[in-house]
Amino acid sequence: MPGPPRSLEMGLLTFRDVAIEFSLEEWQHLDIAQQNLYRNVMLENYRNLAFLGIAVSKPDLITCLEQGKEPWNMKRHEMVDEPPGMCPHFAQDLWPEQGMEDSFQKAILRRYGKYGHENLQLRKGCKSVDEYKVNKEGYNGLNQCFTTAQSKVFQCDKYLKVFYKFLNSNRPKIRHTEKKSFKCKKRVKLFCMLSHKTQHKSIYHREKSYKCKECGKTFNWSSTLTNHRKIYTEEKPYKCEEYNKSPKQLSTLTTHEIIHAGEKLYKCEECGEAFNRSSNLTTHKIIHTGEKPYKCEECGKAFIWSSTLTEHKKIHTRKKPYKCEECGKAFIWSSTLTRHKRMHTGEKPYKCEECGKAFSQSSTLTTHKIIHTGEKRYKCLECGKAFKQLSTLTTHKIIHVGEKLYKCEECGKGFNRSSNLTTHKIIHTGEKPYKCEECGKAFIWSSTLTKHKRIHTREKPYKCEECGKAFIWSSTLTRHKRMHTGEKPYKCEECGKSFSQSSTLTTHKIIHTGEKPYKCEECGKAFNWSSTLTKHKIIHTEEKPYKCEKCGKAFKQSSILTNHKRIHTGEKPYKCEECGKSFNRSSTFTKHKVIHTGVKPYKCEECGKAFFWSSTLTKHKRIHTGEQPYKWEKFGKAFNRSSHLTTDKITHWREILQV
């Protein structure tokens, strides 16, 4: 049998000693994460050798790996032929599966078989370090395991590192059966291998000789400096095939690819929630303890994580170090600037797989996804109402408390939402920074300008699936849909009457208070609502701005014109499901529905007679009071109903025509 190669006799370690090749068949048995880990380990080994001054020239294998090529297609003569010094106490449970072990055995035996198999078998019988008497004689015992030459110990350690990391790449935690026997005197830290101890000690003895020219920061290892430099060069050599994202480090790419695989290896024992990163699980666990060890000295607010406290402190300093080069706006946090920049670029990197809609923020996508599931998991214990988002439930709860925490310093008005207060404050400044290029009209908010622009473009993106009618705004479509469903979510606590719109409920509530804050300066008449006053004012001007293009008839109110147009079109959009009768006005339809219920809620206190509609009760009461509000001043006549006045006028004109 030939003796060991010269390099091992001399105690020198070369890159050939720590390189492993794979055949095409073996390489294809590895998944992407394992292939990437192989690349990472081989490149790291080469950098370590380069640091020690052992690697003089760059091997072709390293060039191949750096370029992202497959290592199995390397020429045979370019690969190495020296056998490694294998560590015999390779614990049995380090092998994840038999097939993987066989692949490694084949790869090693194929290369080093000529040196004899007895030194190459991966010995799995070692259940503990005691079997190999590693602890019996300390350093000497360990050398029996690794070989006597220090270079071989280093070499064995490197090989162990390759296999150890490779075989456990799919495990959340690495387990090792050996006792950690060797203690560093400077720190109570235990190691399984002597080479680890040697490497650990070098942290104390080695000067930080690798210095960054850009910022002056120094490092122990050249590999750390190389990774650090990527911050300035923006070099991102590793690209994800699934999503066009390029991390700066291969390990980051491996972690990133787990996201696409959907694999969540790290599970919380407390609540069962799973994560694809161990760091995320560690962070999550603190939630269950409720501990908030990081306290702000300025305001006393406590936080779970130190990073959150650091970010919070910026609020007190009012420093805004992150500035937008496009518009000059500054922000406290870099993440806010990143999101802000997307407003300028129009970038929407977060796409919904269900409908294809894209968003500029991941949180908005998360919120959007709930639309497809329809899940409402956040329930109010007070009234039983459920919500899709926790923030909406939190906001809703304030309704029950009636508390308005957010107060305007300018006018003292209170709000139950901070966003409402922020919106309100702009009213006091009078600033309208968002201007329409088409008509010059300015707006307080950009969202209002966006909606306004649709008037010029005549774009109606929101379409009703029920009847096909399209609308400029989503809110209008939402209200329109209630016409089909009959939903009336806004209920009056005073009388129990329900409404399809919140504004209608607000308007209705004034009836109970009797308040009439809107007064006509012309005649002194007061009204419950500003819209009614606006309509009333037209009486004094006799202005009829709303004209029918079909017949030329003019009206004082746009709503009356809308109802009038249906006479020409014959449209009757309001259909009764009970009897099938259709109506061209919603008010007429509402009155009609009461007939089917048989309920007559409006009762006369004078005689006890009941009516379907309040208007009929009002007319009836005039019988008891004798009130006659409809007057014909020309003849001194008065009537208790407008229809009676109209009938009398017609009779009068007929008499004149007959004469």
Swiss-Prot record:
Q: Which InterPro entries match?
A: Ikaros_C2H2-ZF (IPR050589), KRAB (IPR001909), KRAB_dom_sf (IPR036051), Znf_C2H2_sf (IPR036236), Znf_C2H2_type (IPR013087)
User: Listed disulfide bonds for this chain?
Assistant: none
Mind telling me which PROSITE patterns this protein's record contains? KRAB, ZINC_FINGER_C2H2_1, ZINC_FINGER_C2H2_2
Q: Where is the KRAB domain?
A: 13-84
Q: Positions of the zinc fingers (C2H2-type)?
A: 210-232, 238-260, 266-288, 294-316, 322-344, 350-372, 378-400, 406-428, 434-456, 462-484, 490-512, 518-540, 546-568, 574-596, 602-624
* GO BP annotations, alphabetical order: negative regulation of transcription by RNA polymerase II; regulation of transcription by RNA polymerase II
Q: Where in the cell is it found?
A: Nucleus
SMART domains registered for this protein in UniProt: KRAB (SM00349), ZnF_C2H2 (SM00355)
UniProt entry keywords in alphabetical sequence: DNA-binding, Metal-binding, Nucleus, Repeat, Transcription, Transcription regulation, Zinc, Zinc-finger
Functional summary from the UniProt entry? May be involved in transcriptional regulation.
Q: Which PANTHER family match?
A: ZINC FINGER PROTEIN, ZINC FINGER PROTEIN 501
Query: Which Pfam families did the record assign?
Result: KRAB, zf-C2H2, zf-H2C2_2
What family does the database annotate? Answer: Belongs to the krueppel C2H2-type zinc-finger protein family.
Q: Name one GO molecular function term.
A: RNA polymerase II cis-regulatory region sequence-specific DNA binding
Q: GO CC: one term?
A: nucleus
Question: What name appears for this protein in its UniProt entry?
Answer: Zinc finger protein 254
This protein's record includes keyword Transcription:
yes
Per the UniProt record, the source organism is Homo sapiens
